């Protein structure tokens, strides 16, 4: 007859209960593929809620829960094909931060003139149609003019835009001027985009630029997001970019890589799917070095009038394919 196990002492029972409730389950616990202790979800949630003063949040809850924000000295790459919404994703993140926190932001934009960037940020923040705003200003509409002027003196006084192609030394000088202007250190910086930084545009040059920006963000002690063009061999426009999609690389330097793409470019879509995806945009966490290394692909509504990116509502789906034309 097999020998029965000895009863546990009260001390042994307490020790086992403490071990089971601990977030550190030791080396003897299997490495599960599909489950993890619920305590990790609460840990992630608490960190997400409490890190307002630490890490910069992008304002997309699913992405923020995966990345848990961007800390000082960390670099994020936002990768995708041209005109696929990469910059727009970060513009929305900037506006969310300006509206909901006391964030001060430095934007390096050698790709677009600062006037155009300012217009896009205003339309996102105030839900304005870009064409209508331009027409109001042309017509001398006082309400529209006052809205723009008031926003520039208040909300948008916490963002500074430089549209030159600056060296790393010049970027540091710009940072010092921003610190002097605000009397404080900025919370976040954006570069749009990597390939337009001074230097060679071949593989060696692009990697050197990525390494230089990473080094700059650490020395400047600032969270940095960098727009990075997808290479020609990175796949179809309507599919998520892989981790190596960035033109000539550079992804090794980043804490995380976000792939931005639009399913509207898929030639196999049905008519109904074309209508739906004519206003959709996908943000994919392609790589994430922050434990527990969560990834994911998240779909949002991209307003064709204001440039706002947010979750879908029922009335967001167009009745026809007007935005595909």
Where do the model's predicted regions map?
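C-terminal regions of RecA-like/P-loop NTPase motor modules
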Residues: 6, 11-22, 32-39, 127, ...
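Flexible loop/turn segments at secondary-structure boundaries
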Residues: 84-86, 113-117, 168, 196-200, ...
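Alpha-helical scaffold elements adjacent to nucleotide-binding pockets in ATP/GTP-utilizing enzyme cores
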Residues: 93, 116-121, 174, 212, ...
């Amino acid at each position: 007859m097999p020998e029965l196990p000895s009863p546990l002492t009260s001390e042994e029972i307490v020790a086992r209960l403490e071990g089971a409730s601990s977030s550190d389950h030791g080396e003897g616990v299997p490495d599960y593929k599909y489950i993890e202790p619920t305590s990790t979800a609460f840990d992630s949630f608490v960190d997400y809620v409490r890190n307002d003063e630490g890490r910069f949040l992008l304002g997309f809850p699913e992405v923020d829960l995966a990345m848990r924000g961007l800390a000082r000295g960390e670099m994020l790459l936002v990768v995708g094909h041209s005109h696929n919404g990469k910059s727009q994703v970060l513009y929305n993140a900037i506006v969310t931060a300006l509206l909901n926190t006391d964030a001060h932001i430095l934007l390096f934009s050698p790709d677009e003139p600062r006037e155009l960037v300012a217009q896009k940020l205003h339309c996102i923040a105030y839900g304005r149609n870009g064409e209508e705003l331009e027409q109001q200003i042309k017509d001398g509409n006082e309400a529209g003019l006052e809205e723009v002027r008031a926003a520039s003196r208040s909300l948008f006084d916490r963002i500074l835009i430089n549209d030159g192609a600056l060296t790393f030394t010049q970027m540091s000088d710009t940072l010092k001027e921003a610190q002097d202007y605000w009397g404080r250190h900025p919370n976040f910086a954006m570069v749009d985009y990597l390939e337009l930084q001074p230097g060679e545009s071949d593989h060696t040059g692009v990697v050197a630029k990525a390494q230089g920006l990473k080094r700059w963000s650490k020395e400047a002690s600032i969270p940095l997001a960098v727009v990075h063009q997808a290479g020609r061999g990175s796949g179809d426009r309507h599919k998520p970019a892989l981790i190596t999609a960035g033109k000539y690389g550079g992804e090794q330097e980043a804490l995380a890589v976000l792939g931005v793409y639009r399913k509207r470019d898929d030639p196999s879509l049905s008519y109904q799917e074309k209508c739906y995806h004519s206003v959709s945009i996908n943000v994919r966490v392609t790589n994430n070095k922050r434990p527990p290394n969560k990834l994911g692909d998240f779909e949002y509504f991209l307003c064709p009038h204001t440039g706002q990116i947010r979750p879908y509502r029922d009335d967001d789906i167009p009745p026809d394919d007007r935005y595909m034309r």
